[in-house]
A protein has these predicted regions:
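Extended substrate/RNA-proximal surfaces in nucleic-acid metabolism proteins
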Residues: 1-121
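Charged catalytic cores and adjacent phosphate/nucleic-acid-binding surfaces used
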Residues: 103-200
Length: 200
């Protein structure tokens, strides 16, 4: 806050809602005091036995592209559902494909699918998280942040996905500069599920 104290809000990451939206909604109904909900997808569909991206074995480039398409289908369903604050780490498959398996994958060629996701989010009043990815390539990176802005998106949070203390706050300022370079002039926090806009 303005007096130098850290404000602690209440939030959750709600993963895999696309497996059972009714269950996800029932869960949220039991937590009315939340300030912030990240909607996220970490698994592929039943075609891949709901396997978590983290555990997916090495594969060919064409198999990886099929996995990205499968993932984006679930992300689009989640975006259309829209009962959350921001969509977390849109380009998450790249973390595991590139950083864990040494591939050179991108979401290039999926512009239509990503645009559909962004339009659904904007229509539902949801935003996106720019995940600093513990200092690696942000999820999503500048190309997709620019597209989000061009489509009318304004709600963006910066998430460090820290998991351990040494990553808390990592690259937060640099990521805000990235947002600004993509035409996004505000970073958001949330209070009582409503975005609060802070000028960068």
């Amino acid at each position: 806050g303005a007096d130098g104290r850290i404000i602690v809000r209440r939030g959750i990451e709600l993963g895999e809602a696309a497996r059972d939206f009714a269950y996800a909604e029932a869960l949220l109904d039991r937590l009315p005091e939340l300030d912030f909900v990240i909607g996220s997808q970490h698994q592929l569909s039943a075609r891949y036995e709901w396997n978590d991206l983290y555990f997916m074995p090495e594969c060919t480039e064409s198999e990886a592209r099929e996995q990205i398409a499968d993932y984006l289908t679930l992300v689009l369903k989640t975006a259309r559902w829209g009962k959350f604050s921001v969509l977390g780490h849109l380009t998450l498959p790249l973390r595991y494909m590139n950083e864990n398996h040494g591939m050179h994958m991108s979401f290039d060629g999926f512009e239509d699918e990503v645009s559909q996701v962004f339009r659904a989010l904007i229509e539902n009043g949801c935003g996106i998280e720019c995940n600093v990815n513990r200092g690696n390539t942000p999820l999503p990176d500048g190309k997709w942040l620019k597209l989000y802005h061009e489509l009318g998106g304004e709600i963006v949070t910066v998430g460090t996905d820290a998991h351990t203390p040494e990553f808390v706050g990592m690259r937060a300022r640099e990521t805000q500069e990235l947002l600004k370079s993509c035409g996004l002039n505000y970073v958001c926090t949330f209070e009582k599920r409503k975005p609060v806009f802070h000028k960068i």
